[in-house]
Regions:
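Extreme N-terminal starter segment of soluble prokaryotic enzymes
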Residues: 1-4
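N-terminal nucleotide-binding beta1-loop-alpha1 segment
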Residues: 6-11
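Glycine- and acidic-residue-enriched helix-capping/strand-helix junction motifs
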Residues: 14-28
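Short beta->alpha junction loops
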Residues: 44-54
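Hydrophobic/aromatic beta-strand patches that form the interior of the parallel beta-sheet core
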Residues: 48, 71, 96-98
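Short acidic active-site motifs
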Residues: 55-59, 80
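Short acidic/histidine-rich motifs immediately flanking catalytic phosphotransfer sites
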Residues: 63-70
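Flexible, gly/pro- and Lys/Arg-enriched active-site loops
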Residues: 77, 82-110
């Protein structure tokens, strides 16, 4: 089984804290953490982070026939990109959106 783990704009600059774990992880630490869990489950991963909407769409389109699923953190595009949603619907690969914060608990414009 293979998943595309796709991260959008500014995700590479965020810091993460996991309940029960001391301190924070930077983006590379978080991806190492995710990779470790996937390795334990025998899941192969292809990880990509980009700040460009078109690159996210290109990765989604290229996923068809290449991966079994997509895990997407679209960053700020979660609220604004119809094009990313269209790409996900058209590519035929099961996908899940992962957000690190709840949009309804953030700024009103989101």
């Amino acid at each position: 089984m293979k998943f595309l783990i796709l991260n959008g704009p500014n995700v590479n600059l965020q810091r993460y804290s996991e309940p029960g774990m001391p301190g924070e992880l930077d983006y590379n630490g978080m991806m190492d953490y995710v990779q470790s869990g996937c390795d334990q489950m025998g899941i192969e991963t292809d990880v990509c982070q980009t700040n460009h909407e078109g690159d996210l769409i290109d990765e989604i389109q290229a996923a068809a026939g290449r991966v079994d699923g997509i895990v997407l953190n679209p960053g700020g595009y979660a609220h604004t990109s119809v094009a990313i949603l269209d790409a996900l619907r058209l590519c035929g690969v099961p996908a899940v959106e992962v957000l690190l914060t709840a949009p309804d608990e953030r700024e009103p414009f989101r």
